[in-house]
């Protein structure tokens, strides 16, 4: 299995999985994808169903990873997934249970049973194990430079804290996270964790990460890697839970006609991009529903064909803050597939048109015309009032308390349900404890606090303020990161 950049030219070399694991962004500014997607046949899915039932989620995940990873021994891969997906790190032994939402014709895939109560744990726990394994094998070290709108940061830091050969520099938008999210990150005082509050919004943080990655000399000197969803291994981990979701919703003997559709609360397009990849592999997913909040860049594209990232000033602060993103970094992967995997055409859009015009328009193309039939995508939006109403309604009618992002998903799911046949699953993003103020506003009461989080907002915190400057960030890395630690 070899990997290619979305901006590849005719002479761009392919890479191995272990190389791109540590590298993150490709040297040409593109994102890595497999040269070809492996396929999942009906018999493959039957075998994975047996493995999931008899051996558990970790063993099933190892089976899927083995389709993409041929430079890590199969026995080692099984051990890696067994360490990543275990209790008590995950509070439910099923890791990803799927339940019917009472009183509706919807299902919920529960992705937030990990150590930080967010779906990001599903990828980060695996990424931490993969990083440590590969760095130990190479005798190397890595400086992770990442950006978070709320959940990625804490998930990454909990997965990477105290790991050999790893330092973490995590950028957050100052004042844009909930008190719980800030406490989860800033109360980690481990010597290999550096929390940074940037004077800007999430997209500014993400741009700083890209600027660091595009400085080849600095990146090489400081061994810079990525945990944001620009890292292919993140998406690969997420592909696994879409397979598990399909297996848990369908019955024994299900075949390619047994379509399951999913609704994915979306900001950076990573989660739903994993659904797209699983669908390309042959997993019988029907419609892929992109649910956005008021920062509706993705919804605009799927409705109109125009991709128009917003400026920092135009990115709204909402009550589903982890989706307050107006430059979807993973979107390039999908556009690469949409354009027939043409690296030159993809580069022309993302490196040239966006820089020159601030948008690109595919509305008149045959690719956009066939978007739903070929790739299954539709979209919808949700507002503050919508998510408050959905949180209150779902608690009253179903006895289930949603976090604001999952509420966006359920709101959109109800709106599109008449268009979709067969099971429809909303992919949960987090537990409501992370968004207490919004839950209180919606329901009149605070969310329950799991025992492991009691008192977290009263702990000592450490964070470094930073101007929105790549040079200032480089100076901070030089000052705070211990090479080889």
Residue ranges and their predicted role:
Residues 1-485:
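PLP-dependent amino-acid enzyme catalytic core
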């Amino acid at each position: 299995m070899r990997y290619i950049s979305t901006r590849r030219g005719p002479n761009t070399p392919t890479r191995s999985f272990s190389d791109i694991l540590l590298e993150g962004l490709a040297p040409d500014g593109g994102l890595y994808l497999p040269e070809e997607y492996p396929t999942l046949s009906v018999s493959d899915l039957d075998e994975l169903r047996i493995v999931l039932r008899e051996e558990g989620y970790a063993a099933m995940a190892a089976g899927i990873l083995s389709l993409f990873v041929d430079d890590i021994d199969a026995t080692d891969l099984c051990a890696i997934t067994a360490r990543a997906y275990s209790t008590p790190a995950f509070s439910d032994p099923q890791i990803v249970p799927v339940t019917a939402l009472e009183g509706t014709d919807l299902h919920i895939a529960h992705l937030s049973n990990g150590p930080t109560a967010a779906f990001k744990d599903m990828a980060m726990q695996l990424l931490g194990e993969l990083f440590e394994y590969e760095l130990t094998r190479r005798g190397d070290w890595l400086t992770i430079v990442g950006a978070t709108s709320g959940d990625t940061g804490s998930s990454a830091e909990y997965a990477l804290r105290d790991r050999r050969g790893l330092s973490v520099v995590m950028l957050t938008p100052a004042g844009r996270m909930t008190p719980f999210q800030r406490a989860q990150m800033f109360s980690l005082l481990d010597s290999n964790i550096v929390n940074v509050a940037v004077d800007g919004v999430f997209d500014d943080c993400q741009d700083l990460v890209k600027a660091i990655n595009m400085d080849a000399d600095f990146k090489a000197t400081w061994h810079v890697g990525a945990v944001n969803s620009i890292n292919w291994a993140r998406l690969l981990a997420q592909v696994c839970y879409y397979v598990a979701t399909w297996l848990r919703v369908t019955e024994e003997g299900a075949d390619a006609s047994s379509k399951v559709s999913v609704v994915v609360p979306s900001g950076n397009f990573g989660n739903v991009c994993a659904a797209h990849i699983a669908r390309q592999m042959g997993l019988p997913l029907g419609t892929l529903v992109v649910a956005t909040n008021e920062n509706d860049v993705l919804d605009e594209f799927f409705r109109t064909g125009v991709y128009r990232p917003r400026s920092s000033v135009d990115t709204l602060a909402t009550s589903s803050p982890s989706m307050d993103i107006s430059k979807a970094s993973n979107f390039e992967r999908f556009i690469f597939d949409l354009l027939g995997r043409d690296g030159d055409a993809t580069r022309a859009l993302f490196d040239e048109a966006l820089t020159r015009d601030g948008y690109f328009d595919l509305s008149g193309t045959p690719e956009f015309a066939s978007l739903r039939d070929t790739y299954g995508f539709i979209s919808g939006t949700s507002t503050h009032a919508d998510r408050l109403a959905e949180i209150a309604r779902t608690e009253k009618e179903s006895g289930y308390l949603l976090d604001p992002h999952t509420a966006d998903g359920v709101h959109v799911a109800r709106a599109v349900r008449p268009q979709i046949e067969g099971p429809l699953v909303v992919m949960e993003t987090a537990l409501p404890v992370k968004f207490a103020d919004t839950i209180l506003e919606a329901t009149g009461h605070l969310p329950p606090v799991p025992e492991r989080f009691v008192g977290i907002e009263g702990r000592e915190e450490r964070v470094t303020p930073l101007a929105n400057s790549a040079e200032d960030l480089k100076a901070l890395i030089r000052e705070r990161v211990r090479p080889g630690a």
